[in-house]
């Protein structure tokens, strides 16, 4: 509200609260000038380059990609590629966490039902998963909780947690006292952790850097 110029700015828009999209409207356009809202840094969805909020940047465009940026510190749920929505399985999740040490806490609520019932929420045939990331100087803590409807049976979840912008190989990755297997890509600065979560219980993944 305090930036009056943004009322007439139409070169980018929010998709939800954590994606910034800047469509290319002219054929053969090689670059795009984009304003990145302040109070957050932003991450190029395709390259992982971090961009400071409150700045205008000239971004090179690619023919097969729409300029897309993610709010730093956010948790983004995704699924593996599929041919149709019939193949979607809410018990197999990919969670991208765009780690930013300036963002101390962030939260994602993710609704799920079997995709078959009408008015599943009203009938209590649903679950609402809650993922929360907390950061300190040398620790990332990822908490998993689940609110289950009265007539829904929660199942174990296979989760691939991908954490972006991790500057070094962690000292340890644990769920409770159990060590978790992980892979760290020093070039891309990404940490991948695979876990099976009994979603009828709370769980906590602690990463010591």
PLM region descriptions:
Residues 176-200:
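Extracellular/luminal ectodomains and secreted, surface-exposed scaffolds of diverse proteins
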Residues 142-148, 203-209:
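Short, hydrophobic/aromatic-enriched beta-strand segments in well-ordered soluble domains
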Residues 69-71, 131, 182, 206-209:
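Short beta-strand element of the conserved SAM-dependent methyltransferase core
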């Amino acid at each position: 509200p305090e930036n009056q110029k943004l009322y007439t700015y139409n070169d980018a828009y929010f998709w939800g609260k954590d994606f910034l999209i800047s469509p290319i409207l002219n054929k053969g356009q090689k670059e795009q000038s984009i304003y990145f809202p302040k109070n957050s840094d932003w991450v190029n969805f395709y390259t992982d380059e971090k961009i400071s909020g409150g700045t205008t940047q000239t971004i090179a465009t690619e023919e097969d990609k729409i300029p897309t940026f993610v709010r730093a510190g956010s948790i983004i749920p995704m699924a593996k590629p599929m041919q149709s929505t019939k193949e979607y399985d809410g018990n197999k999740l990919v969670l991208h966490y765009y780690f930013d040490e300036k963002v101390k806490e962030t939260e994602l609520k993710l609704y799920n039902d079997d995709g078959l019932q009408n008015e599943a929420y009203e009938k209590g045939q649903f679950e609402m998963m809650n993922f929360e990331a907390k950061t300190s100087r040398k620790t990332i803590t990822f908490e998993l909780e689940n609110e289950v409807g009265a007539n829904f049976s929660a199942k174990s979840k296979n989760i691939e947690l991908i954490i972006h912008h991790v500057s070094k190989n962690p000292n340890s990755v644990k769920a409770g006292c159990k060590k978790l297997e992980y892979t760290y890509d020093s070039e891309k600065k990404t940490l991948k952790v695979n876990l099976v979560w009994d979603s009828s219980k709370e769980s906590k993944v602690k990463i010591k850097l």
